[in-house]
């Protein structure tokens, strides 16, 4: 049996105290504890703590090398030696092996060595985007902690706005009804944020 947490989730960072309580709960109920840490490095930057500290309470952790870090593809699974041995066997049985993957591995190593600290830039750009959107009419913005911005837009304005943004080469995903998700990443600059804000202002006018 397994208890699985995600950090970050919806762009929000789980507090360290919450992780400690999850570990205690898992121990009390005989559960393994896994972290979907696709964006654990965003959480680490936001908290100002090493990712190892965030991962410590967990039996296993997954980490994405493409989200935020900018590698073309790839994830890492971390756990005990016995756990990884089992995971490799399951991967082989399910056809998850890959040949000649050295180039992809090299890209992942480059991302880990060069793109972690710069995640702070993504967080800053997300904050800039959120502040600019909050100044517009017909839109409400959730508090931002990392690189995700969630904005609630008036129903009557949303379809036309999304069409306008798409024509401007800005992709905003409808998330839940009138809520839109915007994510900053390695390919987004502060200039791009200004361009996006101008497009939102035009689309909501």
Walk through the language-model features, giving the residues of each.
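Conserved PLP-enzyme active-site core in the AAT-like
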Residues: 1-155, 159-168, 172-188, 196-204
